A protein has these predicted regions:
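Beta-alpha junction/loop-to-helix N-cap segments that form part of ligand/metal-binding clefts
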Residues: 65-128, 223-247
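Hinge/cleft segment of the Venus flytrap/periplasmic-binding protein
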Residues: 277-336
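Pocket-lining segment of extracytoplasmic ligand-binding domains
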Residues: 172-244, 248
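Short beta-strand elements in bilobed, periplasmic/extracellular small-molecule ligand-binding domains
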Residues: 54-73, 136-137, 184-200
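Hydrophobic alpha-helical segments within soluble ligand-binding/sensing domains
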Residues: 120-162, 262-283
Length: 336
């Protein structure tokens, strides 16, 4: 059935491409963000800026309808329903929960979906393969190299013998990297404790618990729930002498010691390029490969490093064998 749908969708997209080629110059794009955090907001800003630039360069107009569901599934479903009712030409889903909801709502409607910052599109069954997604959806992935983050933890502190794993158990983006972290630590013979939270209050309580348990370091993947709480927990962690290693530079911006991962500004630009290719050039999402990125940049918060008694230059030297670049940042609420 899914293969039949893919064939039918390909025909539909081909017909749509013909219509576009006949002179359509205005496209309605519905963008939904999952939650208000530095990384996701940076993605949205770069999608909008790049679409505006591409439109100006090529004589087309993108009418953007931007919404944020603030992690509320009922609001998310209503946003998507409104996009469909308003006859958008394409939807952009920022983060895994939004992409999954959009795919579910649009498969029969034939509306193309481009996702942004989906950590594991295969495990969540958004796509059949990264090379050929197989339906009306494709996009960009911020897949995290968990072993690399683990390597950085032990490069900074070879004697660490208890690691805290802090995440939201309901976040699909955390499932694979947390499993990978456990496997890494098991193989290394290092103990770990799990701490979870589904909102800011619960995350603060989880952080207090890991401080009380005296872990040597904390790992969080690209988890949007923990991201929204980082500004509320980073000072307590630093005061307790516990470094927080994470899967995105926005965590470091908000006070974590380290964020390791993709360049989200570039991810937003590439996402916009894919939107343009589908709408203007008639590219078929079913055979448009998911874009992945080098996530070898380690972003160190120098203020937090100082609070922990760590020297940035020494950290950079220790991290160098395990990443392609080490850069510094200071604490702020959002990227400039």
């Amino acid at each position: 059935m899914k293969k039949l749908f893919a064939v039918m969708l390909a025909v539909l997209m081909t017909l749509s491409a013909c219509a576009f080629a006949e002179g359509q110059t205005t496209y309605k794009v519905g963008i939904c963000n999952y939650v208000d955090d530095a990384s996701l907001n940076q993605i949205v800003a770069n999608i909008q800026d790049q679409l505006a630039a591409l439109g100006e360069e090529n004589g087309v107009t993108f009418e953007i309808d931007y919404k944020n569901c603030n992690a509320d599934s009922s609001v998310l479903n209503q946003i998507i329903a409104n996009f469909i009712a308003n006859d958008v030409d394409l939807m952009v889903g920022v983060a895994t929960p939004v992409a999954m909801a959009m795919q579910s709502a649009t498969e029969d409607a034939g509306i193309p979906v481009v996702f942004a910052a989906v950590s594991d599109p295969l495990a969540t069954e958004l796509v059949e393969s990264l090379e050929a997604p197989g339906a009306n959806i494709t996009g960009t992935s911020d897949y995290l190299d968990t072993a690399a983050v683990m390597n950085l933890i032990f490069a900074a502190d070879p004697e660490a013998d208890m690691i805290g794993l802090l995440y939201d158990i309901g976040q699909d983006a955390s499932t694979t990297p947390i499993a990978a972290a456990k496997a890494y630590l098991d193989e290394k013979g290092v103990a770990y404790k799990e701490y979870t939270g589904t909102n800011v209050t619960e995350v603060i309580m989880a952080a207090d618990a890991l401080i009380a348990d005296g872990v040597d370091a904390v790992f969080t993947p690209t988890d949007n729930t923990i991201m929204t709480a980082e500004l509320s927990i980073y000072e307590a962690l630093a005061e307790a002498g516990i470094p927080h290693y994470t899967g995105a530079d926005s965590f470091a911006l908000n006070g974590a010691l380290l964020g390791y991962g993709v360049d989200y500004a570039n991810l937003g630009v590439v996402t916009a390029d894919m939107v343009y290719d589908i709408l203007v050039n008639g590219a078929d999402p079913a055979v448009t490969p998911v874009r992945t990125f080098d996530n070898g940049t380690a972003t160190v918060n120098t203020e937090t490093a100082e609070a922990l008694g760590l020297d940035f230059e020494a950290l950079s030297a220790a991290f160098a064998p395990f990443c392609t670049r080490v850069q510094s940042i200071v604490t702020a609420e959002s990227f400039d």
